[in-house]
Amino acid sequence: MSQKKKASLSKIHTGMNSSSKQVLSSTSSANEKTEDDVGDEMDFSLQCDACKKLIIGLNNLDRFDCGHFYCLVCSPLQPKENHSSCATSTSPSNAFTREVSPQQIAEHTGELSNNGAERGKIRGSTRATRKGSVNKSKSGRTRRHKKVPDQRLWYFLYLSKPVVVSLPTDATYHDLMARLYTLLGVSGKTHMITLRTQKSSSEEGEGEFSGRGDPAPLEVGDSKTRLSDLKITRHKMLLLDVDDQKKDGSGEEKKEKKSAEKEKKISHENVQSLSPSSRAEDPRSS
C-alpha cells in the first residue's frame, strides 16, 4: 500500500472519531437535566392553596417558608407577612406536627392490645454501649458498666386516664406504691392508694353465668411480695384510686370519748348491783 493511500485512510478514521465524539457529547448534554426539568417531566401536580386548582410541574408553583404552595398567578397576591404566624411557619420539617390539647385526649377504655406491643419488656441488658461512653481509669483499663436490670411496664387507669410505671422485674409491692405516691404527688400520711383488678374481655365471657361483679381489690399478703407473684391480669389495666385518710379526732374529742366509756361502765355496774340475782348473792340483803 502506497503512502498516499495510508494518509487518506488515517484522515477518514480521524474524521469518523471526531463525528462520533460530537454525537456522544450532544446526547450526554441532552441527558443532563436539572431538578426542575425532572420535576416538570414527572408531572408533579399540586393544589394551589388559594384557587384550589391542580398545577402540573414544580416550576409553576411558588412555595412559601410556611409550607403553603401557590400558583404563579396567586403567589403575587399573597403577602408573605400574613404567613409568618402560620401553624407550620417554624420549619418545613415541622409542617405536619401539631400540639394535642388535653381536651382532645379521649378517655382510655383500659383494654390493652393482645399483640404484646404495649406489654413488652424493656431489655436493658441488651442495649449496645457506645465506645465513646466507656470511661477509662488512670491505668488505661476500661471500666465495666453494671448490668442494667430488665424493666417491666405496669399500666393503671386513674380518672379514666392511663398511667404507666416502669419498674425492675424483681420489684416488690412496696416499690410500686412508693413510685405511685411519687408520681401522683401525694403523701402516704394524708392519702391512701388502693388498687383494684378488673376482668379481661375473655374472662368476662367465661364468667357470664356466674356474674361479672365489680372490680375487686388487689390481694396483697405482704408489702415485700414481688409483683410477679401477684395475680394481676396483663390484658386489663389496674384501677387506681386515691382517697383521703380518715384523721383521728382532736385531744378533746378523745377525752370526751374516754369519759363516755367510763360513764357507760359505771352505769352498767350499777344496773348489775340492782338486779335480783346480785341481791340474792349479797349477804346484807338477808
Swiss-Prot record:
Biased composition range(s): Basic and acidic residues? 243-268
Secretion signal span: none
- Give the span(s) annotated as Disordered: 1-38, 108-146, 196-227, 241-286
| Compositionally skewed regions (Polar residues) per UniProt | 269-278
Point to the regions of Low complexity compositional bias: 18-29
The molecule here is called: Uncharacterized protein F10E9.2
